[in-house]
Amino acid sequence: MSGSSLPGALALSLLLVSGSLLPGPGAAQNAGFVKSPMSETKLTGDAFELYCDVVGSPTPEIQWWYAEVNRAESFRQLWDGARKRRVTVNTAYGSNGVSVLRITRLTLEDSGTYECRASNDPKRNDLRQNPSITWIRAQATISVLQKPRIVTSEEVIIRDSLLPVTLQCNLTSSSHTLMYSYWTKNGVELTATRKNASNMEYRINKPRAEDSGEYHCVYHFVSAPKANATIEVKAAPDITGHKRSENKNEGQDAMMYCKSVGYPHPEWMWRKKENGVFEEISNSSGRFFIINKENYTELNIVNLQITEDPGEYECNATNSIGSASVSTVLRVRSHLAPLWPFLGILAEIIILVVIIVVYEKRKRPDEVPDAGPMKTNSTNNHKDKNLRQRNTN
């Protein structure tokens, strides 16, 4: 072997050796965490969720374990439906493994250390193996504190009366220092309500359906999670927006909608007037599509038929307090309708031309037939002149 070929052969050998050490597409890969659970502090009655995301080849198995406070070595496995069905475990496996642990209606006994374990070791469930070697772990500490006691006024139902309404909250007991408090409606903070007070009031001077919803008095503390209480203000639906009429051409699509205020959110229903009576729409043709979103509903009709779809449509909103209905008139024109203005103009032009032609024919005088040249007085005068000249001679 020549000296020049020796380094090349050596490099090729090293490349083959190093290539054999690199993991291929189907090579095994140890489990590793992409996302680990995070520690939280909660109040009794609240809920928490812990997330765990792991990778590896093959996809690692995920388990959840729990240990009480100050007993970190006494872990017990958590199963879906445990603790009187307050525990929910949802796990999905694909290119990686993802699991969510959720516990609701928390009690003080739910405090402790929660552990996400993952492993793709073939012997991971062998009792003779040391779990600390075959499983990787990620821990989170959940601290559950006693929720402060908040006394609230009763729920309110808005009727036709416009008498003022006052909502009240009173923080009667708390082991933590209050920072500030405020009111929210449907999750949005109400302006000019933030203050440092345990007794809170919110006044609605002229209550209407649009004032209904979920009101919360929210308390923030120095070293504890915020606490809140709910007061429901209810009202019958009041439909505030809809189309009075909809004009479309045959073959087009039509969309009718209704918006309402009121709480609780209503159940929506669409009906069409048949023989003077509103009847619920039956989607036998498959051309009707209804979308309901809390205080909004939408009726879509595709490929309008001039013989079936025109008429009066009604949207109805109903909740536990009352109901409301409004109507929309749908008109469907023939697909030739866009040509009607053009045809009308063309007809007017034709009629105008005919009138002009007839008028011109009647206005023209009768034509005189040709009768040859006519004799004039000048000819006679010439004859008379000649006669005089002869007489003189």
UniProtKB/Swiss-Prot annotation:
Transmembrane segments: 339-359
Region (Disordered): 366-393
Glycan attachment points: 170, 196, 228, 283, 295, 316
GO molecular function per UniProt: cell adhesion molecule binding; cell-cell adhesion mediator activity; transmembrane transporter binding; type 1 fibroblast growth factor receptor binding
Domain Ig-like: 29-134, 148-234, 237-327
SMART domains documented for this protein: IG, IGc2
Topology of the protein relative to the lipid bilayer: Single-pass type I membrane protein
Tissue expression: Isoform 1 is ubiquitously expressed. Isoform 2 is brain-specific. In brain isoform 2 is highly expressed in hippocampus and cerebral cortex and weakly in cerebellum and lower brain regions. In the hippocampus isoform 2 is found in the dentate gyrus and CA1-CA4, the striatum oriens of CA3 shows the higher level.
Localization of this protein: Cell membrane
Keyword Cell membrane among UniProt keywords: yes
Major site of localization recorded for this protein: membrane
Protein keywords: Cell adhesion, Cell membrane, Disulfide bond, Glycoprotein, Immunoglobulin domain, Membrane, Neurogenesis, Repeat, Signal, Synapse, Transmembrane, Transmembrane helix
Position of the signal peptide: 1-28
One record GO biological process: axon guidance
Membrane topology, Cytoplasmic segments: 360-393
Disulfide bonds: 52-116, 169-217, 258-315
Extracellular side: 29-338
Free-text comment about domains: Some isoforms lack the first Ig-like domain which may confer homophilic adhesion activity. However, they can bind and activate FGFR1.
Protein name listed in UniProt: Neuroplastin
Name of the gene: Nptn
